[in-house]
């Protein structure tokens, strides 16, 4: 019986060996090897695309791209070199000269309604325009479907220079996710649409709008950190971002020692959702940005036919500077601010700080020039910049001290004259 088993085993082994070394088996091995190699190539390509998310939003904005992607110059910066060539043929642009901030607000609101079927309250448009005068970063936050991205897109459309919409990706962590990186294998720089627009803006007087769509799906303080730091520099001529670590003779003319100038005519508008899929925005970002809350849809209204506006960034900044001179915050409200600052320091160990005071002194005059009133502007910016800081307080202490703060606001500014501040305090009370 044992001999029969051994004989059967040997015979089976021989058959297996014959199959393994048959032509069919060899071909199967070859096809399997080809399949493995193909899988590796596909895996590498997928990871390359993940590393270069700019390819996604380049396609998203392809209709706004007027240059070709050829690389006849031999430069490692294909798109930027094309801009250098194309700018020589650009025709001069005639900009509007006689216009006011209030007119801009009304015309933009009417244009969005008539041409784009987007409806916004005039107060929100005033806050939007005044916010742009304070910071190069404006955050639009609120419930989904309230028109955050649409508002930012409409602003670029109204200004005759379409906004560049960049869908932020969850894995973004650094500057290269926004502007691209140098590919050692191809010896080319993987340029993004944002890099192209930044380079183009340095040649132009137009207002450029970059929309960071769903900006807090990744940590803003990570991927936008260098932008925030550079924007803090008081002199716009010193605002440069690193692109590459060295300089090549064939590099585009606008790059200085591998750095690109952050254009003073570019604004960043981020849209933010507050849900489980997003990160909270840090104080570092909030302190440097302006915020507009869009929490409800506006009613439809009749809007007359309104033309687009051609206004230079220089003219827009001139209008804001004129507003600051003509509508400086009243001494009475300055005294109220000082008193509120003392109250908050005593009861909550929170203070305004120089940055917030500077923002207040810009925001209020511009909001007034947009057609609003001083106290409404003060209520709005205090609720976002000062009262919001109380969210970090001990919940039990905050709940017990909230009524005293609301009473003090009534005493200082008049009963129910600060509705936005009191509404935010009440919301914090409920969440405590």
PLM features: residue spans?
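Compositionally biased amphipathic helical and low-complexity segments enriched in hydrophobic
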Residues: 3-5, 13, 70, 81, ...
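Intrinsically disordered, low-complexity coil segments
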Residues: 23, 116, 369-372
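Short, strongly hydrophobic alpha-helical membrane anchors
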Residues: 1-23
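AAA+ P-loop NTPase catalytic core and its hallmark functional loops
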Residues: 33-319
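Long, low-complexity, intrinsically disordered N-terminal extensions of eukaryotic proteins, enriched
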Residues: 12, 47-51, 55-59, 416-432
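Generic cytosolic/nucleocytoplasmic N-terminal low-complexity/intrinsically disordered segments
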Residues: 2, 14, 62-63, 174, ...
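Hydrophobic alpha-helical transmembrane segments
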Residues: 20-34
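Alpha-helical lid/collar subdomain of P-loop NTPases
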Residues: 76-89, 306-432
């Amino acid at each position: 019986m044992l001999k029969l088993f051994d004989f059967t085993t040997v015979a089976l082994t021989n058959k297996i060996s014959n199959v393994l070394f048959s032509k069919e088996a060899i071909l199967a091995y070859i096809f399997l090897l080809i399949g493995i190699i193909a899988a590796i190539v596909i895996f590498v390509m997928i990871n390359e695309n993940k590393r270069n998310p700019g390819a996604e939003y380049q396609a998203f904005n392809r209709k706004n791209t007027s240059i070709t992607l050829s690389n006849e110059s031999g430069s490692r910066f294909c798109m930027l070199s094309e801009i250098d060539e194309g700018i020589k043929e650009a025709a001069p642009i005639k900009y509007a000269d006689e216009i006011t901030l209030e007119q801009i607000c009304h015309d933009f609101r009417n244009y969005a309604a008539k041409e784009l079927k987007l409806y916004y309250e005039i107060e929100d448009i005033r806050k939007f325009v005044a916010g742009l005068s304070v910071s190069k970063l404006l955050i639009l936050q609120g419930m989904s479907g309230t028109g955050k991205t649409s508002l930012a897109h409409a602003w670029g459309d109204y200004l005759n220079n379409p906004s560049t919409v960049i869908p932020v990706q969850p894995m973004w962590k650094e500057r290269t996710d926004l502007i691209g990186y140098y590919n050692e294998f191809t010896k080319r720089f993987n340029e993004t649409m944002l890099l192209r627009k930044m380079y183009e803006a340095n040649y132009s007087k137009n207002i450029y709008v970059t929309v960071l769509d769903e900006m807090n799906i990744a940590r803003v303080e990570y991927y936008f950190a260098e932008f925030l730091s550079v924007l803090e520099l008081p002199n716009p001529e010193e605002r440069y971002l690193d692109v590459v670590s060295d300089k090549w003779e064939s590099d585009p003319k606008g790059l200085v020692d591998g750095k690109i100038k952050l254009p003073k005519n570019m604004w960043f508008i981020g849209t933010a959702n507050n849900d489980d899929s997003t990160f909270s925005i840090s104080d570092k970002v909030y302190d440097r940005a302006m915020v507009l809350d869009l929490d409800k849809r506006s009613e439809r209204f009749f809007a007359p036919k309104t033309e687009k506006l051609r206004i230079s960034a220089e003219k827009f900044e001139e209008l804001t500077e004129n507003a600051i001179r003509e509508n400086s915050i009243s001494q009475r409200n300055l005294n109220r601010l000082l008193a509120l600052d003392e109250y908050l320091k005593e009861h909550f160990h929170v203070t305004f700080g120089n940055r917030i005071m500077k923002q207040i002194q810009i925001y209020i005059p511009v909001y007034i020039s947009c057609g609003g009133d001083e106290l409404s502007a003060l209520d709005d910016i205090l609720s976002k910049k000062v009262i919001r800081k109380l969210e970090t307080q001990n919940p039990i202490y905050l709940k017990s001290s909230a009524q005293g703060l609301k009473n003090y606001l009534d005493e200082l500014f008049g009963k129910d004259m600060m509705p936005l501040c009191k509404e935010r305090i009440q919301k914090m009370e409920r969440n405590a």
